[in-house]
C-alpha cells in the first residue's frame, strides 16, 4: 500500500481553564459515539463501481460494457498544452476508452451526502487492478501485473442547486493490457473518512458484443431479454457453473427448462443478462442417436478464456469472442458454429485448468461411437476436436461387450484422461488413458455397494471391508491438480491421493445423491445434492458438514429476516453455487411478490458452522455461586504467521503506482481535461512496461527511469509554478507518483501462491497461542510431556518427490505459545527447463492443526472464517519477472583490465559502445528481477552464437541455420568462423561452445568465407561491423529452470582487411610513393634550367617589343638610344631589378 501525506485540519484553540474535566467528558462521549457509529456502519457500507466510456465521464447514471479493446487517440491536444510540465509534448500519448466510476452507499443514509462528507474529510478511494495472464504462454509471456491508482473526485454533470451540492463520484482510468482479458479491481480507502471494507470487483473484457448500423451495442450470441421471469426458475433446478479457473472473462449458465436461453455475465454475476441464443436447434436424431425426445434446453454450458461451448440435445456449438488483446480479430466468430455434426454427444465435461498453452473441453458420445471420447482443444480462439482412442474403443479393454463413459476429467499437465466407465453388467471402473503414449490402464474397480462405516468419520477401502445393501451409484469425477486429490461422487464420496487406494467419507449420507461439486482450489469444497442440499468439507480432512439446510442455517436465516435483508426470502430457488476468491457464493432467485429478482449472495460457511458447533459446558461451584464454564472446541486460542515472504515477491507480481495529477481547483475537483491527462499518463506508464525489453542493462532496470531521467532536476521549478497558479492548465504532475513498486507494504499473511525456481526455498513461522491448560495438567505442576496430543501442527505435501519440508518446533512456556518454523525446498526433480510459464509443476502444501478443521472459527468484521487449515499452492518452474541482460558496463571494465586499454568508436554511442576487433571480448550478463528490483551476475553456463550481422544497423540480416553452424561451430571446415575461444567444453553434439562467466573470452577471426571478412572502409575511419549475438542457457545450465534467451547487437570496429587487399593496397601505396619521390627529384634537378630558360625567353620577347615602342621618338634621340641599346645587348641580359637596370630606366626616362 502506498501512503501519501495528508493535510490535517487545524485544531481549534481552546481557552485555558483551571479545570477541563467537562471538555474531557465531552470528548470521551464523542469518541464513544464515533466508535459506535463506526462499528454500526463497518459491515454495511459498500463500494459501488460501474464502467464509463471516455466521452461519458461525469454522467452519474451512465454504465457501459467492456466492448472496446484498443486504445484511442483523444488526449493528444490536452498534452500539447502542458508546456510547463515534466512530460514531453512531442510524445504520442494515447488513452484507454473507459473510466471506472466509484462511489459507496450505506443503508439508511444519503449516499450523496456521505460522498461529499468523505471527500471534505480527505477520503480517497484507492484502486488496485490485477491482471490475469493468458493461458497461451507461447504468444504471451506469463506475468503477474498490478497497478495501484488513486481515484480522482469529480462533480457529475447536470443540474445541481449549489456547487457544493452536486453529485460527487470518483474516477480512475480503466487500463488494460495485451494478453489479458480478466482483471480484478480492489477498492479500499486511504484510512480517512467512513469505514468501508475492501471490496473486489471483476471488470472483464466482453468479446461477445457487436455494433449495429447506428453504433448501438448488441450481443452477437443471441437476443437480450429485458424481463427475467419467475417461470424461468420455477421448473429449473440448480446447475453447475463451469469455466476455466481464473481465466474465463464471462460466465454462462444454461438449464432453463425447454428454452434455448442462458444467463450471461462478464462480472462474475455482479450483474447479468438473460440471452436467447441464436442457434438453429436442428434435430438430427437417428438410430445412431438414442434420444427419445427433443428439448430446447441448454443442458451443458462451459466458458473458456475466449470461447463458449453449449450442448442442446445431442448437438454441440461453440462461439469464439473477438478479443484483440489475445489474438487476431479474424479468429472471432460471427455466429454459433456446430461441431461434431455426425456424433451424438450426451455430455460435455469441463477441464478447469489449461495446459500446454491451450484450454480443453471433453465431449462424451453415445450411439455408434460409444466408448470413445472427443477432446476439444482451444488455442488462440481456434477450436479443434480429436477422437480418442484412435483405432480402438475403451470398451475393448474392459470385461463385457459394451460400455458407457459416464464422466471424464483431463489432467493437462500429465496428459491423462480419467474415465468413469460403466460396463453392461452395471459394474463401474476408473480408467486412465494417456493421450501421449496411447495407453490405457484400469486404476480401480468401484465397489457395488456402500461400505459399512458406523460411528466412523472415514473408512479405508480394503478387502476386509463389509458393505451394506445400498448400491453405489457413481455420477462423476473430480480431480484437483494442486493436491492430486481425486474424488468419485454419487450417493457417496470416495477420495484418493494416488488414484489407486480410496477412502470412504462416512459423514455423507447414502440417502442423498450429489448433483455436482464445486472447488475453491484453496482447500475447500462444496457439493449440491439432487434435493438442493449443500454439504461442505475441507480437503485433507475427513469430515463432511451439512450447511443447508441445518440448524445453523435456520438460525442465520431468521437473523437475516429480522434485519430485513433484501438478499433472503422465504420463497427462493437455488440457481447455482460457485467459489470466488475462497468465498462460497449462491446464485438465488427470490420469489417475493412484486420483487422477483436474481441475487448473488455470500454463503457464510464459517458462521453456519459456528452456529452448528456444540457448546459443551460444565457447572462449577464458586463459593456460594455456580458458574457455567464453556469448553474450548478449538485447540488453540489464536494463530498467525510471522517472518513470511512478501506476497508481492512470493507470487512474482510486478506492481506500479499511478496517482492523479494535482489540480489547482479550490475543492480539489477534477475536470475532463485533468482526467484526460490522468488517462494519458497511465497509458504511457503501462506502455513503457510492455516495451521494456532492453538487451543492454540500464543502470536502473526500471521502465520509468528513462521517462523522468532528465526531468527530475526541475521538479522544484514545476512545483513552484503550480503552487503559484502559473502552471499550464492548472495541473501539477508529480514524477514520483508514476513509478514501479518493489516492496509493497501491507501485504501480510501467508501468500496465496509461491513460485520456486530450481533449488530455491522459502520459510515462515506459524505461531499457535494456546489456552491456559494446554501445557499443564492436573497432576503436574510443570509442563506436561503430552503437549503433542493437545497442540500439534501437520504438513502434507501433495508431491513429496518434488519438495522437501522441515519443521522446527519451539515452545515458549511463559507465553503458552508454540512456534513452528517451516522450510520448503525444491528437490530439482519435477520441472524441466523452459521459458516463463512453461513446464510449470503445480503442487501444494497443506498446513493443518490437529483437531482444528471445523472446530476453529475466527470472527472478524468481514465475517467468520475457518481457521487451522490452509492449502498453500506452489508452482515449481521458471518464475515470472526474470530476464537476462547484457552487462555492458562491467564488460567494458573487464575488457580494459584484460586488454590494458579500451578504445571506443570515434563517433560514440552511449546506447551501444564499441569493442575493438583485436581485443579479447568477454561478455558478462545480469539476471534482472523485475519484481524485487534486484540484479546479479549470471553465473550459469550458456551457448553464444552469432546469428546475424551487417555493416550498418539498417543492413543487419538474420543468418540461416547452415550459416550459423559455419560461423560459430568448432566443427566448421569451410574457413567461415567469425570467432573462436579457448574453451574446451562443447555441447553434446560438439557443434557449439559452452561458455560461462569464467570463460577466457572470445577472439574475433572473421575468416575468408565469413560475412565480416574483408570489409571495405566507407570513410577515413577503420572498418566496422554489427554482430547479432544469441545467448541461451537451454540444455547447458543446471542452475535454474529458466530458459534464458537473449539477442543483442555488438558493435565491433577496427576490422582488418584481407591479405590480398592489404598487399594490393601496400603495392599501390609503395608505387605511388616511389613515383612521387622520383618526380620530386626530377623536379629539383630540372627546375633551375626551366627558370633560366623562362627568363631568357622573357628577355627576348622584351627586346623584340622595345623598337616598336620607341619608333615615334626623335630621330637623334631615338638613334642614340637605339645605338646604346644595341651596344648593351652584347653584354647579355642583366638580372631584373639590378642596379644596371635602374640606371638604364632613368636614362630612358630623361631621354
UniProtKB/Swiss-Prot annotation:
Region named Disordered: 1113-1151
Composition skew (Low complexity), residue ranges: 1113-1123
Glycosylation sites: 356
Ribosomal protein keyword on record: no
Membrane topology value: Single-pass type I membrane protein
Broad class of where this protein is predominantly found: membrane
GO cellular component: CatSper complex; sperm principal piece
Keyword Glycoprotein: yes
Membrane side Cytoplasmic: residue ranges: 1085-1151
Stretches assigned to the Extracellular side: 39-1063
Family: Belongs to the CATSPERG family.
Protein name in UniProt: Cation channel sperm-associated protein subunit gamma 1
Protein's organism: Mus musculus
Underlying gene: Catsperg1
Amino acid at each position: 500500500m502506498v501512503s501519501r501525506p495528508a493535510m490535517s485540519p487545524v485544531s481549534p484553540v481552546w481557552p485555558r481553564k483551571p479545570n477541563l474535566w467537562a471538555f474531557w467528558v465531552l470528548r470521551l462521549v464523542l469518541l464513544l459515539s464515533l466508535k459506535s457509529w463506526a462499528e454500526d456502519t463497518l459491515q454495511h457500507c459498500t463500494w459501488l463501481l460501474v464502467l464509463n466510456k471516455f466521452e461519458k465521464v461525469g454522467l452519474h447514471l451512465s454504465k457501459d460494457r467492456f466492448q472496446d479493446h484498443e486504445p484511442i487517440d483523444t488526449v493528444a491536444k490536452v498534452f500539447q498544452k502542458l508546456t510547463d510540465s515534466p512530460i514531453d509534448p512531442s510524445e504520442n500519448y494515447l488513452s484507454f476508452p473507459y473510466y471506472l466510476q466509484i462511489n459507496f452507499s450505506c443503508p439508511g443514509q444519503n449516499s450523496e451526502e456521505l460522498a461529499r462528507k468523505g471527500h471534505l474529510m480527505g477520503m480517497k478511494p484507492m484502486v488496485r487492478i490485477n491482471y490475469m495472464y493468458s493461458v497461451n504462454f507461447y504468444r504471451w509471456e506469463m506475468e503477474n501485473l498490478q497497478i495501484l491508482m488513486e481515484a480522482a473526485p469529480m462533480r457529475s454533470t447536470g443540474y445541481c442547486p449549489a456547487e457544493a451540492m452536486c453529485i460527487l463520484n470518483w474516477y480512475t482510468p480503466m487500463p488494460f493490457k495485451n494478453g489479458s482479458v480478466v482483471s480484478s479491481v480492489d477498492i479500499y480507502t486511504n484510512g480517512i473518512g467512513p469505514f468501508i471494507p475492501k471490496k473486489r470487483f471483476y471488470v472483464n473484457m466482453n468479446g461477445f458484443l457487436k455494433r449495429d448500423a447506428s453504433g448501438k451495442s448488441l450481443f452477437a450470441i443471441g437476443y437480450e431479454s429485458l424481463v427475467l421471469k419467475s417461470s424461468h426458475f420455477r421448473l429449473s433446478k440448480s446447475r453447475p457453473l463451469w469455466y476455466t479457473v481464473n481465466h474465463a472473462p464471462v460466465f454462462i449458465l444454461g438449464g432453463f427448462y425447454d428454452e434455448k436461453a442462458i444467463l450471461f455475465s462478464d462480472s462474475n454475476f455482479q450483474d447479468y443478462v438473460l440471452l436467447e441464443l441464436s442457434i438453429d436447434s436442428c434435430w438430427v436424431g437417428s438410430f445412431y442417436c438414442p434420444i427419445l425426445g427433443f428439448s430446447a434446453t441448454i443442458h451443458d454450458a462451459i466458458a473458456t478464456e475466449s470461447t463458449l461451448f453449449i450442448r442442446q440435445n445431442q448437438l454441440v456449438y461453440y462461439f469464439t469472442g473477438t478479443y484483440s488483446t489475445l489474438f487476431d480479430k479474424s479468429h472471432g466468430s460471427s455466429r454459433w458454429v456446430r461441431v461434431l455434426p455426425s456424433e451424438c454427444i450426451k455430455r460435455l465435461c469441463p477441464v478447469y485448468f489449461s495446459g500446454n498453452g491451450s484450454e480443453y473441453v471433453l465431449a462424451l458420445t453415445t450411439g455408434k461411437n460409444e466408448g470413445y471420447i472427443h477432446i476439444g482443444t482451444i488455442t488462440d480462439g481456434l477450436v479443434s476436436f480429436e477422437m480418442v482412442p484412435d483405432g480402438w474403443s475403451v470398451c475393448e479393454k474392459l470385461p463385457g461387450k459394451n460400455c458407457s463413459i459416464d464422466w471424464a476429467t483431463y489432467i493437462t499437465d500429465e496428459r491423462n484422461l480419467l474415465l468413469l466407465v460403466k460396463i453392461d453388467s452395471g459394474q463401474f471402473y476408473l480408467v486412465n488413458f494417456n493421450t501421449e503414449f496411447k495407453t490405457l490402464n484400469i486404476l480401480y474397480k468401484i465397489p457395488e455397494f456402500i461400505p459399512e462405516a458406523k460411528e466412523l468419520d472415514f473408512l479405508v477401502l480394503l478387502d476386509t471391508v463389509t458393505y451394506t445393501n445400498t448400491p453405489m451409484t457413481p455420477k462423476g469425477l473430480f480431480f484437483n491438480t494442486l493436491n492430486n486429490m481425486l474424488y468419485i461422487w454419487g450417493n457417496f464420496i470416495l477420495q484418493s491421493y494416488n488414484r489407486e487406494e480410496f477412502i470412504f467419507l462416512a459423514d455423507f449420507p447414502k440417502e442423498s445423491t450429489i448433483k455436482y461439486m464445486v472447488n475453491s482450489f484453496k482447500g475447500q469444497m462444496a457439493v449440491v445434492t439432487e434435493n438442493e442440499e449443500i454439504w461442505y468439507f475441507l480437503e485433507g480432512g475427513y469430515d463432511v458438514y451439512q450447511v443447508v439446510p441445518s440448524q445453523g442455517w435456520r438460525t442465520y436465516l431468521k437473523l437475516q429476516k429480522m434485519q430485513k435483508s433484501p438478499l433472503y426470502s422465504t420463497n427462493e430457488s437455488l440457481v447455482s453455487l460457485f467459489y470466488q476468491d475462497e468465498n462460497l457464493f449462491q446464485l438465488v432467485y427470490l420469489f417475493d411478490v412484486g420483487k422477483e429478482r436474481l441475487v448473488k449472495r455470500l454463503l457464510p460457511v464459517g458462521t453456519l458452522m459456528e452456529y452448528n458447533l456444540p457448546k459443551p459446558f460444565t457447572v462449577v461451584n464458586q463459593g456460594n455461586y455456580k458458574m457455567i464454564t464453556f469448553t474450548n472446541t478449538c485447540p488453540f486460542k489464536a494463530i498467525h504467521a510471522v517472518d513470511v515472504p512478501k506476497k508481492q515477491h512470493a507470487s512474482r507480481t510486478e506492481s506500479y503506482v499511478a496517482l492523479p495529477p494535482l489540480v489547482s481547483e479550490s475543492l480539489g475537483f477534477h475536470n475532463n481535461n485533468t482526467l484526460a491527462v490522468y488517462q494519458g499518463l497511465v497509458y504511457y506508464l503501462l506502455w513503457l512496461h510492455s516495451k521494456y525489453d532492453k538487451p543492454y542493462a540500464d543502470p536502473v532496470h526500471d521502465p520509468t527511469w528513462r521517462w523522468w531521467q532528465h526531468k527530475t532536476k526541475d521538479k522544484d521549478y514545476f512545483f513552484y509554478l503550480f503552487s503559484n497558479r502559473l502552471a499550464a492548465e492548472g495541473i501539477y504532475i508529480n514524477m514520483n507518483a508514476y513509478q514501479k513498486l518493489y516492496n509493497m507494504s501491507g501485504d501480510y499473511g501467508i501468500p496465496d501462491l509461491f513460485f520456486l525456481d530450481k533449488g530455491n526455498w522459502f520459510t515462515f513461522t506459524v505461531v499457535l497461542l494456546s489456552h491456559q491448560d494446554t501445557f499443564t495438567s492436573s497432576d503436574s505442576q510443570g509442563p506436561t510431556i503430552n503437549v503433542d496430543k493437545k497442540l500439534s501442527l501437520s504438513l502434507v505435501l501433495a508431491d513429496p518427490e518434488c519438495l522437501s519440508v522441515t519443521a522446527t518446533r519451539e515452545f515458549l512456556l511463559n507465553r503458552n505459545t508454540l512456534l513452528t518454523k517451516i522450510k520448503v525446498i525444491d528437490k530439482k526433480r519435477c520441472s524441466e527447463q523452459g521459458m516463463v510459464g512453461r513446464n510449470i509443476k503445480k503442487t501444494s502444501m497443506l498446513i493443518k492443526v490437529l483437531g482444528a478443521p471445523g472446530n476453529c472459527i475466527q470472527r472478524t468484521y468481514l465475517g467468520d472464517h475457518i481457521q487451522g487449515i490452509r492449502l498453500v499452492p506452489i508452482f515449481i518452474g521458471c518464475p515470472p519477472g526474470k530476464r537476462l541482460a547484457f552487462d555492458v558496463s562491467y564488460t567494458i571494465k573487464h575488457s580494459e583490465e584484460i586488454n590494458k586499454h579500451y578504445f571506443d568508436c570515434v563517433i560514440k554511442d552511449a546506447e551501444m559502445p564499441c569493442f575493438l576487433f583485436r581485443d579479447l571480448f568477454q561478455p558478462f550478463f545480469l539476471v534482472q528481477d523485475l519484481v524485487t528490483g534486484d540484479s546479479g551476475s549470471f553465473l550459469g553456463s550458456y551457448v553464444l552464437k552469432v546469428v546475424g550481422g551487417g555493416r550498418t544497423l539498417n543492413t543487419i540480416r538474420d543468418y540461416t541455420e547452415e550459416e550459423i553452424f559455419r560461423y560459430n561451430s568448432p566443427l566448421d571446415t569451410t574457413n567461415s568462423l567469425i570467432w573462436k575461444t579457448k574453451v574446451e567444453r562443447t555441447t553434446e553434439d560438439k557443434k557449439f561452445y559452452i561458455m560461462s562467466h569464467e570463460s577466457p573470452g572470445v577472439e574475433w577471426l572473421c575468416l575468408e568465407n565469413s560475412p565480416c571478412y574483408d570489409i571495405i572502409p566507407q570513410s577515413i575511419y577503420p572498418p566496422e561491423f554489427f554482430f547479432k549475438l544469441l545467448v541461451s542457457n537451454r540444455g547447458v545450465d543446471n542452475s535454474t529452470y529458466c530458459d534464458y534467451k537473449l539477442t543483442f547487437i555488438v558493435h565491433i570496429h577496427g576490422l582488418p582487411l584481407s591479405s590480398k587487399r592489404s598487399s594490393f593496397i601496400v603495392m599501390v601505396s609503395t608505387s605511388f610513393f616511389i613515383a612521387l619521390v622520383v618526380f620530386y627529384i626530377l623536379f629539383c634537378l630540372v627546375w633551375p634550367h626551366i627558370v633560366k630558360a623562362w627568363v631568357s625567353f622573357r628577355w627576348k620577347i622584351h627586346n623584340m617589343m622595345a623598337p616598336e615602342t620607341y619608333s615615334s621618338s626623335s630621330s637623334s634621340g631615338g638613334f642614340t638610344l637605339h645605338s646604346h641599346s644595341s651596344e648593351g645587348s652584347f653584354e647579355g641580359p642583366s638580372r631584373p631589378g639590378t642596379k644596371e637596370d635602374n640606371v638604364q630606366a632613368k636614362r630612358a626616362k630623361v631621354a
